[in-house]
Amino acid sequence: MNLTNHFLVAMPSMKDPYFKRSVIYICEHNQDGAMGLMINAPIDITVGGMLKQVDIEPAYPQSHQENLKKPVFNGGPVSEDRGFILHRPRDHYESSMKMTDDIAVTTSKDILTVLGTEAEPEGYIVALGYSGWSAGQLEVELTENSWLTIEADPELIFNTPVHEKWQKAIQKLGISPAQLSSDAGHA
């Protein structure tokens, strides 16, 4: 099972308050573990505020300043000082990994210089930190009924209001959160 380019959607019964009602985009999943970014956990800083904190000046005139008011997200509890930009592919940046035709992840600072300008990606979220699992850890959590998995949808990442992402992700399975039980079935 490879969950790269899938969402992990926290079950309503998620016991860990850090991940309660979270939606995580899985960037990498292999025999060594998994790495993903929470896409619905905004923190109390805007993209523009973050750019000021790290002394990033825009490479072009800021024609899209409204986007600088977007929140930065908590990507997860690991390396919270590291930034990740989940975006629609546009240009090639120094350190980008194209996940699909519609989703890429960039960790280099060069993408930050185009945020708020006409050269910015069509859709993006900025996350600090990531969610990580050691080898076999995610698989155990799945058998414990902690997560639902669904194929990633760029519309949910980039165009769905933050407060609706968890419910919309569950609805993609054709169910509502109220229909979910925390009890795993055994045959």
Curated annotation (Swiss-Prot):
<dbReference type="InterPro" id="IPR003774">
    <property type="entry name" value="AlgH-like"/>
</dbReference>
<dbReference type="GO" id="GO:0005829">
    <property type="term" value="C:cytosol"/>
</dbReference>
<protein>
    <recommendedName>
        <fullName>UPF0301 protein VC_0467</fullName>
    </recommendedName>
</protein>
<dbReference type="Pfam" id="PF02622">
    <property type="entry name" value="DUF179"/>
</dbReference>
<comment type="similarity">
    <text>Belongs to the UPF0301 (AlgH) family.</text>
</comment>
